[in-house]
C-alpha cells in the first residue's frame, strides 16, 4: 500500500465501495507469504463480502476455500475474474506523450528485470515506440529493494550524472 500506485488504487476502491454502501477493509502482507495467509484469515473471520486480491502467493484453491467472491489484479487464476492493465498500450502512450512534448533523449526507469513483472512489457513497448520514432532511450532498472523502500535517489542521481543531455524520463 505504501507504493503510490497501490495507494491510489485503494483510495479509488474505497470511494466506490462507500458509494455502494459497503465498507472497505485493507490488509497488506508486504510480500510475506505467511503474513498474507494470516491477512486472509482475518478477512475470513470478519465475514467479508468479497476480496480484491493483488498478490501472487496464494493459490486459486486457497481463495476458493474462503467462500467469498474474489477478483484478482494482473494474476490469472482459472475460473476467477481478473482485472488486467494494458501495459503494452501504457508503454506506447507514455512514449508518444513524451515524444509529443518534444523529447529526443529519454530514460526509462523500470523495475528489476528478473522479477518478470507485468511492467516489463510496458517498458518494452516504451522502448519500441522510441525506436520506431527515432528517439534515443536508455533503460535503467530499479532494484526490488528500491521499489519497496521507495529509495530511488541514488539511481536518479546516477541517471542525471550519466545523461546530462536527457530531456525526458
Identify the residue ranges that each predicted region occupies.
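Glycine-/small-residue-rich active-site loops that bind phosphorylated ligands and cofactors
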Residues: 1-2, 31-32, 58, 114-115, ...
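N-terminal winged-helix
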Residues: 1-15
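Phosphate- and divalent-cation-binding pockets in alpha/beta enzyme and binding domains
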Residues: 5-8, 35, 61-62, 125
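Central regulatory/effector-binding core of bacterial HTH transcription factors
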Residues: 15-60
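Bacterial carbohydrate/catabolite-sensing allosteric modules
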Residues: 12-22, 38, 44, 65-72, ...
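Short amphipathic alpha-helical surface micro-motifs
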Residues: 7, 51-54, 152
Amino acid at each position: 500500500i505504501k507504493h503510490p500506485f497501490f495507494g491510489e488504487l485503494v483510495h479509488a476502491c474505497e470511494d466506490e465501495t462507500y458509494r455502494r454502501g459497503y465498507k472497505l477493509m485493507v490488509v497488506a502482507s508486504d510480500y510475506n507469504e505467511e503474513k498474507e495467509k494470516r491477512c486472509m484469515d482475518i478477512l475470513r473471520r470478519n465475514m467479508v463480502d468479497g476480496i480484491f486480491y493483488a498478490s501472487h502467493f496464494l493459490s486459486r484453491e486457497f481463495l476458493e476455500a474462503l467462500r467469498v467472491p474474489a477478483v484478482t489484479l494482473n494474476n490469472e487464476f482459472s475460473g476467477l475474474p481478473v482485472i488486467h492493465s494494458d501495459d503494452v498500450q501504457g508503454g506506447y502512450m507514455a512514449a508518444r506523450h513524451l515524444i509529443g512534448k518534444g523529447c529526443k533523449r529519454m530514460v526509462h526507469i523500470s523495475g528489476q528485470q528478473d522479477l518478470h513483472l507485468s511492467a516489463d512489457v510496458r517498458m518494452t513497448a516504451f522502448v519500441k515506440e522510441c525506436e520506431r520514432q527515432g528517439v534515443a532511450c536508455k533503460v535503467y532498472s530499479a532494484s526490488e529493494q528500491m521499489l519497496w523502500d521507495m529509495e530511488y535517489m541514488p539511481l536518479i542521481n546516477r541517471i542525471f550524472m550519466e545523461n546530462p543531455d536527457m530531456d525526458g524520463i
